[in-house]
UniProtKB/Swiss-Prot annotation:
Residues exposed to the Extracellular side: 68-290
GO BP terms in the entry: cell adhesion; intracellular potassium ion homeostasis; intracellular sodium ion homeostasis; potassium ion import across plasma membrane; sodium ion export across plasma membrane
Cytoplasmic side: 1-39
Free-text domain note: The C-terminal lobe folds into an immunoglobulin-like domain and mediates cell adhesion properties.
Cellular localization per UniProt: Cell membrane
GO molecular function list: ATPase activator activity
immunoglobulin-like as annotated region, ranges: 193-290
Species this chain originates from: Ochotona curzoniae (Black-lipped pika)
InterPro entries, per the entry: Na/K_ATPase_sub_beta, Na/K_ATPase_sub_beta_sf
TM regions (residue ranges): 40-67
Higher taxonomy: Eukaryota, Metazoa, Chordata, Craniata, Vertebrata
Gene name linked to the record: ATP1B2
Full protein name: Sodium/potassium-transporting ATPase subunit beta-2
UniProt xrefs under PROSITE patterns: ATPASE_NA_K_BETA_1, ATPASE_NA_K_BETA_2
Glycosylation sites: 96, 118, 153, 159, 193, 197, 238
Length: 290
């Protein structure tokens, strides 16, 4: 014989719910007395307080082993990469000469990027260094802080400096300037005490034909040793990265050209297929003309 469970009315359900929330006979709130709730809250307060203290202690111990100025592990930063400016999403520099909006954003980015390189700012913050040698500043047991940096003046970029330039870095005339910079690696002695320079070329034969002629600033794409080593952001507060500007003079219009620039230095490998940015950078250049 099947016994059917009596169906509760809506009023009964509400009354049972109200009694569960607060039972005036037993003085229980949601099934527990005040003392029981106090013990529960005390337990979780102690439990999470202990976890917080353990986490804080662990972080403090770990931070004691980490330098504020130099990364502890740098094995994956042995070879600096190259990057370009203006910075674009896909390393594509596309210029429509007749459309100001297509290149004005590049010009604005370059103006902001090159502002710290103004000669007046460099003269205030940085030193005139002796070229052809590293600018070493050892601590010798005493923290030598902050480190001084060598001047890299905007005027060294010649026709790509943008100073008094009505062509806007050449973008308005279809002869754009692209800036190459080497990523910073702490205590890296670039060039292994030998001169180094940046070279650019088309990636394929057809790219080389369409790339045409170009000039580089400083001359021959040279990067002087005096800008190395780099001691880190906190030590080298006013450090100014050296740049190489490439001005493309007669790129074949309306054709996408693949360009690759490399740093030629004794201790920088540029043939690692696993890291296509190690010592080199590839980008696409297109000059549209109607």
């Amino acid at each position: 014989m099947v016994i059917q469970k009596e169906k509760k009315s809506c009023g009964q359900v509400v009354e049972e719910w109200k009694e569960f929330v607060w039972n005036p006979r037993t003085h229980q709130f949601m099934g527990r007395t005040g003392t029981s709730w106090a013990f529960i809250l005390l337990f979780y307060l102690v439990f999470y307080g202990f976890l917080t203290a353990m986490f804080t202690l662990t972080m403090w111990v770990m931070l004691q082993t980490v330098s504020d100025h130099t990364p502890k592990y740098q094995d994956r930063l042995a070879t600096p990469g190259l990057m370009i400016r203006p910075k674009t999403e896909n390393l594509d520099v596309i210029v429509n000469v007749s459309d100001t909006e297509s290149w004005d954003q590049h010009v604005q980015k370059l103006n902001k990027f090159l502002e710290p390189y103004n000669d007046s700012i460099q003269a205030q913050k940085n030193d005139v260094c002796r070229p052809g040698r590293y600018y070493e500043q050892p601590d010798n047991g005493v923290l030598n802080y902050p480190k001084r940096a060598c001047q890299f003046n905007r005027t060294q970029l010649g026709n790509c400096s943008g100073i008094g330039d009505p062509t806007h870095y050449g973008y308005s005339t279809g002869q754009p300037c692209v800036f190459i910079k080497m990523n910073r690696v702490i205590n890296f002695y670039a060039g292994a005490n030998q001169s180094m320079n940046v070279t650019c070329a088309g990636k394929r034969d057809e790219d080389a034909e369409n790339l045409g002629n170009f000039v580089m600033f400083p001359a021959n794409g040279n990067i002087d040793l005096m800008y190395f080593p780099y001691y880190g952001k906190k030590f080298h507060v006013n450090y100014t990265q050296p740049l190489v500007a490439v001005k493309f003079l007669n790129v074949t219009p309306n054709v996408e050209v693949n360009v690759e620039c490399r740093i030629n230095a004794a201790n920088i490998a540029t043939d690692d297929e696993r890291d296509k940015f190690a010592g080199r950078v590839a980008f696409k250049l297109r000059i549209n003309k109607t």
